[in-house]
């Protein structure tokens, strides 16, 4: 058995989990989400916990077993605690501003960049407008959103200008030494 997949997932208080065919629905205090599962694995809810089982020991089934259990665990954690990802904006005149469901960036281009946030994702900017925090219930959507924001102006290795993850370390390069 998969070491991760065979562990049952305890359902926290104030959380409802329902399985409808291959669709798992999770509702909690922070919000609700649903995601499809592969038909090769079965998800069952009983006695306050979620159990994931697989029909055989093929390599594909083993992989899907652990994956499905982790997706269920992430969904439960998301509706209880939520997820967040920090981004930092480095560069002279580079800043961000949240306006409703949009983030307006000044990233050194000749025009402002407007990024529309997907459903279920919120953003906050600090007072200096250089630290951005995106929050959401769905870990997958949150990661994709953070990656798309970073891709607007990836950090460059010479001066470190651009948008980077808060915990990311940029390997810096030396510039040209000049003609001798």
Swiss-Prot record:
Cellular component GO terms, alphabetical: cytosolic large ribosomal subunit
Annotated function: This protein binds to the 23S rRNA, and is important in its secondary structure. It is located near the subunit interface in the base of the L7/L12 stalk, and near the tRNA binding site of the peptidyltransferase center.
Gene Ontology molecular function, alphabetical: rRNA binding; structural constituent of ribosome
Protein name in the entry: Large ribosomal subunit protein uL6
Species per Swiss-Prot/TrEMBL record: Anaeromyxobacter sp. (strain Fw109-5)
Oligomer and partners: Part of the 50S ribosomal subunit.
Domain of life: Bacteria
Gene Ontology biological process terms in this record: cytoplasmic translation
Gene3D superfamilies: Ribosomal protein L6, alpha-beta domain
Similarity-based family: Belongs to the universal ribosomal protein uL6 family.
Keywords carried by this UniProt record: Ribonucleoprotein, Ribosomal protein, RNA-binding, rRNA-binding
UniProt keyword annotation of Oxidoreductase present: no
Membrane-traversing stretches: none
Gene label: rplF
Keyword RNA-binding among UniProt keywords: yes
């Amino acid at each position: 058995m998969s070491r991760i997949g065979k562990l049952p997932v305890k359902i926290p208080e104030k959380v409802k989990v329902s399985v409808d065919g291959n669709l798992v629905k999770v509702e909690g205090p922070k919000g609700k989400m649903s995601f499809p599962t592969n038909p090769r694995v079965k998800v069952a809810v009983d006695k306050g916990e979620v159990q994931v089982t697989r029909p055989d020991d093929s390599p594909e089934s083993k992989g899907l077993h652990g994956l499905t259990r982790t997706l269920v665990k992430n969904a439960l954690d998301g509706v209880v605690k939520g997820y967040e990802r920090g981004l930092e904006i480095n560069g002279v005149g580079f800043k961000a501003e949240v306006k409703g469901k949009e983030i307006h960036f000044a990233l050194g281009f000749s025009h402002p960049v407007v990024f529309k946030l997907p459903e279920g994702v919120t953003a906050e900017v600090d007072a200096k407008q250089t630290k951005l925090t995106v929050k959401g219930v769905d870990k997958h959507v949150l990661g994709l959103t953070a990656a798309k924001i970073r891709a607007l102006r990836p950090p460059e290795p010479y001066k470190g200008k651009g948008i980077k993850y808060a915990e990311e370390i940029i390997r810096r390069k030396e510039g040209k030494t000049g003609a001798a």
